[in-house]
Amino acid sequence: MGTPGEGLGRCSHALIRGVPESLASGEGAGAGLPALDLAKAQREHGVLGGKLRQRLGLQLLELPPEESLPLGPLLGDTAVIQGDTALITRPWSPARRPEVDGVRKALQDLGLRIVEMGDENATLDGTDVLFTGREFFVGLSKWTNHRGAEIVADTFRDFAVSTVPVSGSSHLRGLCGMGGPRTVVAGSSEAAQKAVRAMAALTDHPYASLTLPDDAASDCLFLRPGLPGATPFLLHRGGGDLPNSQEALQKLSDVTLVPVSCSELEKAGAGLSSLCLVLSTRPHC
């Protein structure tokens, strides 16, 4: 059976989608925010891809940018992946629903079992779903409703699935994430701390917790691309983005920290974990 939580972060491949010029036009989630520097956003995205491929050693697949999908780079919202199963989501925004088509095909080509939501009353953004290695938490937010959470539970029946209220316009993974198989990291805002308290009340598993000054710093990815026993990585927002959280992140001593920047992409609503999908095609991962 192995150690509980040992499957967290196992990965061999990463999927990203290029940044289209339309992302800077204000048509997406960044409308009303400061103007987005397209070239800088594309550089950030390129560096992220480079870190996934070169630093972490993942097989990187990049879908081409599509001008009709300004928020296409936020493909973390389009699927929930665990083991060999990919649940294709139904994003809250109707304009974003065509984003799932290219992701579905890419995941099919990698041999994953595809599950469709198939309920027009359900909404689900992938970044509202947090997998701890032992269980799932699904944020009930502006973006994700009860029916969406029920479909997560129906799809991943081997795991407990609990719902966590998320206030405002945040996604759950914009408030908290996994710093390791037994460690939840969370921002210091009331919304983030409320989410962590709700998770603690719902779980049967003991998790350590680490509070970070910035909510956005908790949107990180714990990844284990190597062989069992190899030191895992934590892909996280670096000091150029969130300097106040770097000292706290150093307390995660059992991981190799890999900093990246997405401060420009953030203007379009991107959190770090929304910018890629990671998966394993290896057996027993």
From Swiss-Prot:
Q: Which residues form the active site?
A: 171, 276
Question: GO MF terms on file?
Answer: hydrolase activity
Q: What class of enzyme is it?
A: hydrolase
Q: What is its EC number?
A: 3.-.-.-
Concerning SUPFAM superfamilies, the annotation shows: Pentein
State the post-translational modifications. Phosphorylated by TBK1. Phosphorylation inhibits the translocation into the mitochondrion upon Sendai viral infection.
Q: What UniProt keywords apply to this chain's record, in alphabetical order? A: Cytoplasm, Hydrolase, Mitochondrion
Function statement: Putative hydrolase with unknown substrate. Does not hydrolyze N(G),N(G)-dimethyl-L-arginine (ADMA) which acts as an inhibitor of NOS. In endothelial cells, induces expression of vascular endothelial growth factor (VEGF) via phosphorylation of the transcription factor SP1 by PKA in a process that is independent of NO and NO synthase. Similarly, enhances pancreatic insulin secretion through SP1-mediated transcriptional up-regulation of secretagogin/SCGN, an insulin vesicle docking protein.
Belongs to which family? Belongs to the DDAH family.
UniProt-recorded name of the protein: Putative hydrolase DDAH2
Q: Which organism is it from?
A: Mus musculus (Mouse)
| Organism ancestry | Eukaryota, Metazoa, Chordata, Craniata, Vertebrata
